[in-house]
Swiss-Prot record:
Domain Protein kinase: 12-294
Annotated keywords: ATP-binding, Cell cycle, Cell division, Kinase, Meiosis, Nucleotide-binding, Nucleus, Phosphoprotein, Serine/threonine-protein kinase, Transferase
Binding site for ATP: 18-26, 41
Assembly mode: Probably associates with cyclin-H (ccnh) and mat1 to form a multimeric active enzyme.
Protein name: Cyclin-dependent kinase 7
Modification after translation, per record: Phosphorylation of Ser-163 during mitosis inactivates the enzyme. Phosphorylation of Thr-169 is required for activity. Phosphorylated at Ser-163 and Thr-169 by CDK2.
Keyword DNA-binding: no
Inhibition and activation profile: Phosphorylation at Thr-169 is required for enzymatic activity.
Catalytic activity: L-seryl-[protein] + ATP = O-phospho-L-seryl-[protein] + ADP + H(+); L-threonyl-[protein] + ATP = O-phospho-L-threonyl-[protein] + ADP + H(+); [DNA-directed RNA polymerase] + ATP = phospho-[DNA-directed RNA polymerase] + ADP + H(+)
Active site feature: 136
Top EC class, one word: transferase
């Protein structure tokens, strides 16, 4: 007999607060029946003007995509249920790439990095072949299961593409991973926005810190151009026609081999393709997977042999998240919006 919503919610023990966005809060939890670790994404139901039949459109889109997409490197939806003013989506998870990158006790070998990027591109190629943009790729949206398999997650901003005249919002992708065309306000774009984000994630894996971490769109563009050089109409046709375009000083940029001194020629070729300013000629997922970088030694590390987060690092992250959770509760009390009991 199928369990009712309240009984399904009680199957999971909440362990840790992982993060919060504009539309959702994510928790780490344990399935009491199987003892497996899951991620629970609680999507807030919006106002009537933002909802359809009481369900937030973002939630509907994410549930629909997770049900339609089936690939080893895309997160699977275990369950979805509504309770009070939230919709909960459940997915398997052990950790995410951000935890791995920040754990300085771990050594990321060239083979490890190749494995992470290979799995990211395989999942992305599948999405793009099915005419779906992710639009929010970043390390903590790349989950890793207990077998070391990387899975693209968080499809709250994912969108179908393909219509040549379709207009989208440019306020997508976390700023540090946002492509220049988005920073210049482009309303029509394609797979290039995801590919730039992959380049930024690859750079972060190599450097162990975010490659370009601007605190505003203008600051982000300045950092990009200082590092990679300022594009021109010759290198990026149509750039000056973008809605929020502003002219920049002509920075010469720094050769990528000086920024990523340990990278070989094949890896530098991939980075250059991902960091191409003209989105029309930026390397696609399918093109990237055919590059020599993935066919030469070392081969990608098998999933079970990839590094696992240090328990002390996980504990530190849990402590940080606990402090964030306390601040959220304090803010809620001050605003008079704290619920008596937090439920799934």
């Amino acid at each position: 007999m199928a369990l009712d919503v309240k009984s399904r919610a009680k199957l999971y023990e909440k362990l840790d607060f992982l993060g919060e966005g504009q539309f959702a809060t994510v928790y780490k939890a344990r399935d009491k029946t199987t003892n497996t670790i899951v991620a629970i994404k609680k999507i807030k139901v919006g106002h009537r003007t933002e909802a359809k039949d009481g369900i937030n459109r973002t939630a509907l889109r994410e549930i629909k995509l997770l049900q339609e997409l089936s690939h080893p490197n895309i997160i699977g939806l275990l369950d979805a249920f509504g309770h009070k003013s939230n919709i909960s989506l459940l997915c398997f998870m052990e950790t995410d790439l951000e935890v791995i990158i920040k754990d300085t006790s771990l050594v990321l070998t060239p083979a490890n990095i190749k494995a992470y990027i290979l799995m990211s591109l395989q999942g992305l190629e599948y999405m793009h072949n099915h005419w779906i943009l992710h639009r929010d790729l970043k390390p903590n949206n790349l989950l890793l299961d207990e077998n070391g398999v990387l899975k693209l997650a968080d499809f709250g901003l994912a969108k179908a593409f393909g219509s040549p005249n379709r207009v989208y919002t440019h306020q997508v992708v976390t700023r540090w991973y946002r492509a220049p065309e988005l920073l210049f306000g482009a309303r029509m774009y394609g797979v290039g926005v995801d590919m730039w984000a992959v380049g930024s994630i690859l750079a972060e894996l190599l450097l162990r810190v975010p490659f370009l971490a601007g605190d505003s769109d203008l600051d982000q563009l300045t950092g990009i151009f200082e590092a990679l050089g300022t594009p021109t109409e010759e290198t990026w046709p149509g750039m000056s026609n973008l809605p929020d375009y502003v002219s920049f000083k002509l920075f010469p940029g720094t050769p990528l081999e000086h920024i990523f001194s340990a990278a070989g020629d094949d890896l530098l070729e991939l980075l250059k393709g991902l960091f191409t300013f003209n989105p029309c000629t930026r390397t696609t997922a399918s093109q990237a997977l055919k590059m020599r970088y993935f066919s030469i030694r070392p081969g990608p590390t098998p999933g079970p042999q990839l590094p696992r987060p240090n328990s002390s690092t996980e504990a530190l992250k849990e402590k940080e998240n606990l402090l964030i959770g306390i601040k959220r509760k304090r803010d809620s009390i001050e605003q008079g919006t704290l619920k008596k009991k937090l439920v799934f």
